[in-house]
A protein has these predicted regions:
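Glycine/proline-rich active-site loop of Rossmann-fold NAD(P)-dependent oxidoreductases
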Residues: 152-159, 192-203, 226-229
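Substrate-binding strand-loop-helix patch
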Residues: 176-183, 205-223, 233-244
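NAD(P)H-binding glycine-rich loop region in Rossmannoid oxidoreductase-like domains
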Residues: 35, 39-102, 115-117
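Substrate-positioning beta->alpha
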Residues: 92, 172-193, 201, 213
Length: 320
């Protein structure tokens, strides 16, 4: 397994172990408390360390000449910046795929993203480039494209608790999604091993409906916290100005190019729904978006607020 250190990776690893699979995780060697906690919590798994960008490391430190039936990858670039995306989402995966094809591995399960159905960003093109290689590889493949994650929609909880406004782009209903929990997604990914109906398929997947807009997310938080609703509407045009400015400055200052791409990513998520895109109408359609699991975003909000569950939002905590 690749990418076991992230929250989706951990959930998938737990699901694999729960189903009785013997799992070897190949990951970067880190000494952070988070990684130590993962190793402590998941002692039924074997951890091996090395670099996913080094073919020799993947072979000698990862596979070690052993036979494997399936590769499961929840690996993804951390920031979405162009270099990171092509290094991890494409190059690292490509190196692993080339190796496993020579080792008798029969099946490859890939965690991708639903947003690649309408590619406008470098990380989306990188993901699609590897998806194409995987589809053409001859292996049994399952490409899982989830909608939104719970923690991606939880970055404003502390802001609202402090009495600040909930930020929305435009009118707050430009987008909607059917978010899926880590645990439900992990189970869905793990089930792809045995479920032949998911073999040789691209699998968009969301959590239970109905689809939720940013305004509905904010309204629920205010109700939950017993606070009067207070929204601040951010014009999408502001993001356009930021992108144009960073794009122009990036020609002179290379370090700003990644920031420009990150601004483009922000605009994409502010204006594009994380639902299946109807290819005939070019409209995002919640009815076409498959659902899996029972966990709801609003129940997750309750746990975070009333049970004081600590979740590392990392890059998701954009609005503070």
């Amino acid at each position: 397994m690749l990418g076991a250190s992230g929250t989706i990776g951990q959930a998938t690893l737990r699901a694999l172990l729960h189903e009785g699979h013997e799992v070897i995780c190949f990951m970067r060697k880190e000494t952070s408390p988070a990684h130590a906690q993962i190793r402590h919590d998941l002692q039924d798994c074997t951890f091996r360390y090395g670099s996913v960008l080094d073919e020799d490391s993947i072979s000698q430190e990862g596979f070690q000449g052993e036979h494997f039936d399936v590769v499961v990858s929840c690996m993804a670039s951390r920031t979405g910046s162009p270099k990171d995306a092509w290094d991890i989402d494409f190059k690292a995966h490509s190196k692993v795929l080339a190796l496993v094809k020579t080792m008798g591995v029969k099946q490859f399960i890939l965690l991708s993203a639903i947003c690649v159905q309408k590619p406008l960003l470098e990380f989306q093109y990188a993901k699609l480039a590897f998806e194409k290689l995987l589809i053409e590889s001859g292996l049994i493949y399952s490409i899982v494209r989830p909608t939104a994650f719970f923690k991606s929609l939880s970055g404003q909880i502390e802001r609202v608790k402090k009495g600040k406004a909930f930020l929305v782009f435009g009118n707050g209903v430009l987008t909607s999604c059917k978010p899926i929990s880590d645990a439900n997604l992990g189970t869905f990914i793990a089930n792809c091993i045995q479920d032949e109906s998911r073999h040789h398929k691209i699998l968009p997947i969301g959590g239970p409906g109905p689809a939720i807009t940013p305004m509905q997310q904010g309204q629920y938080l205010f109700t939950l916290l017993n606070k009067p609703p207070k929204f601040k509407h951010v014009p999408v045009g502001l993001l356009d100005v930021i992108i144009l400015t960073l794009s122009a400055l990036g020609k002179l200052i290379p370090s700003l190019r990644d920031k420009c791409e990150l601004a483009k990513i922000g605009r994409y998520y502010a204006t594009e729904s994380m639902l299946v895109l109807n290819t005939k109408t070019q409209v995002y359609d919640p009815l076409l978006t498959p659902e899996f699991g029972q966990d709801s975003l609003f129940d997750f909000y309750k746990k975070m607020i009333f049970n004081r569950e600590a979740i590392d939002l990392k890059y998701h905590a954009v609005f503070k």
